[in-house]
Amino acid sequence: MAKKGNITSRNLRLSDQIQKELAEMIQREIRDPRLGLVTLQSVSLTPDYAHAKVYFTVLGAEPETAAAILKEKAGYLHSLLFKRLHIHTVPTLHFHHDTSVEHAIEMSKLINEANATRAKDDE
């Protein structure tokens, strides 16, 4: 069985499937204008498949507001997943705002500033 660290290939496949299903369900089933545009970045499952950390980014809304709405709808999304996935245990969903994109943008700006400063010093 292929493993990445201590994550099995089944864990990775199920994580990907949950991410795809949730992305579709959030777009089609949750009709809350306060939510904005949610993009699911990744899903991380515990080894026993009991819990899933769902990492998301959001445009057009505050991350805290989006997280609160997703947390409120987690039970509903869980029940929809149960109907779609046909597996014995559907993990409990835990939504987390993914700040890695913001950090990457910030780091890119710092690198660009450093390069601009270096270019001025070289002149």
Curated annotation (Swiss-Prot):
Q: Which residues form the signal peptide?
A: none
Q: Which SUPFAM superfamilies match?
A: Ribosome-binding factor A, RbfA
Q: Could you cite one Gene Ontology molecular function of this protein?
A: ribosomal small subunit binding
Keyword Methyltransferase on entry: no
- A Gene Ontology biological process term: maturation of SSU-rRNA
- Gene Ontology terms, cellular component aspect? cytosol
| Compartment(s) where it occurs, according to its Swiss-Prot or TrEMBL record | Cytoplasm
The record's Pfam families line, in alphabetical order, gives: RBFA
Which of UniProt's keywords are assigned here?
A: Cytoplasm, Ribosome biogenesis
Question: Any keyword Nuclease?
Answer: no
Family classification: Belongs to the RbfA family.
Q: Sum up the protein's function in the record's words.
A: One of several proteins that assist in the late maturation steps of the functional core of the 30S ribosomal subunit. Associates with free 30S ribosomal subunits (but not with 30S subunits that are part of 70S ribosomes or polysomes). Required for efficient processing of 16S rRNA. May interact with the 5'-terminal helix region of 16S rRNA.
Concerning PANTHER family, the annotation shows: RIBOSOME-BINDING FACTOR A, CHLOROPLASTIC-RELATED
Describe the subunit structure: Monomer. Binds 30S ribosomal subunits, but not 50S ribosomal subunits or 70S ribosomes.
Q: Record's HAMAP family?
A: RbfA (MF_00003)
Identify this protein by name: Ribosome-binding factor A
Q: Which gene encodes it?
A: rbfA
